[in-house]
């Protein structure tokens, strides 16, 4: 997908999501930021550095990226080996390495699996290992390219919680490419793409409470909002909620007052 005149900033310490229909250019942006694709024109700046051949190694050391297929990211023979892979490539002393591995595994709740082989892990556990490997390198920016897309519901929930916990506890900047409504709802800022261009930006509420904007990015109105509209027809007024959880909480309060 060609990216055309795309310009945006990701504030340091923020949780930003990029959304859009399949083929809108979301993953292309992730690969451009990681230096996996070369831009034809324009400029990309990360942590004050322009992305070019001279700065590529420095920038990659400040970025961690997790892709959607957990099987394609597991390199080591065990969980411990996989987390250690990047550290070994950077010649981190063995004594320091063990402490970093332990701390990174604790962050994603995989400490008891350090000696497990990848074949014994679920998809969600493999993604947690991928995140641990990224955290071990102490990046300033975490990029998740549809990291939950290939997981079952339990795995999705586990990864979303891990990502949010890391962001809240460390203050790391997170850029997540996702279709997940629950994840988008928790973001500070949303960038909406369509056909390689940015068509809308703003808070989750600004994007999802505007049906015209949703049509532009070819996304459906969240089910919670459709249900609210039907309840309104029955004389039950509710606030707009992006997620079902928010709507259910309001309905419970409504029921307790009856």
Residues of each region from the PLM?
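Helix-to-loop junction immediately C-terminal to a conserved catalytic motif
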Residues: 34
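Conserved ABC transporter NBD signature motif
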Residues: 42-50, 59
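Conserved ABC ATPase "signature" region
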Residues: 95-113
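Conserved ABC ATPase signature
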Residues: 117-121, 125
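Conserved catalytic motifs of ABC-family nucleotide-binding domains
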Residues: 138
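Catalytic Walker B motif of ABC-type/P-loop ATPase nucleotide-binding domains
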Residues: 142-145
């Amino acid at each position: 997908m060609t990216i055309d005149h795309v310009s945006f900033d990701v504030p340091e310490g923020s949780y930003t999501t990029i959304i859009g229909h399949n083929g809108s250019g979301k993953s292309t942006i992730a690969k451009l930021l990681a230096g996996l694709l070369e831009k034809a024109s324009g400029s990309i700046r990360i942590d004050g550095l322009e992305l070019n051949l001279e700065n590529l190694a420095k920038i990659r050391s400040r970025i961690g990226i997790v892709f959607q297929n957990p099987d394609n990211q597991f390199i080591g023979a065990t969980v411990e080996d996989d987390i250690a892979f990047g550290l070994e490539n950077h010649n981190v002393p063995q004594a320091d390495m063990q402490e970093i591995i332990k701390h990174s595994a604790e962050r994603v709740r995989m400490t008891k699996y350090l000696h497990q082989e990848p074949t014994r892990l679920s998809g969600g556990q493999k993604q947690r290992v991928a995140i641990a490997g990224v955290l071990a390198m102490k990046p300033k920016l975490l990029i998740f390219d549809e990291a939950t897309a290939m997981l079952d519901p339990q795995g999705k929930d586990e990864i979303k919680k891990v990502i949010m916990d890391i962001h809240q506890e460390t203050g790391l900047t997170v850029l997540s490419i996702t279709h997940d409504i629950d994840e988008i709802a928790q973001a500070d800022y949303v960038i909406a793409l369509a056909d390689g261009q940015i068509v809308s930006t703003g808070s989750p509420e600004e994007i999802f409470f505007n049906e015209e904007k949703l049509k532009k990015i070819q996304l459906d109105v969240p089910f919670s909002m459709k249900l609210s509209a039907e309840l309104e027809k029955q004389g039950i007024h509710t606030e707009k909620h992006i997620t079902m959880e928010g709507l259910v909480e309001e309905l419970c309060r409504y029921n307790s007052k009856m």
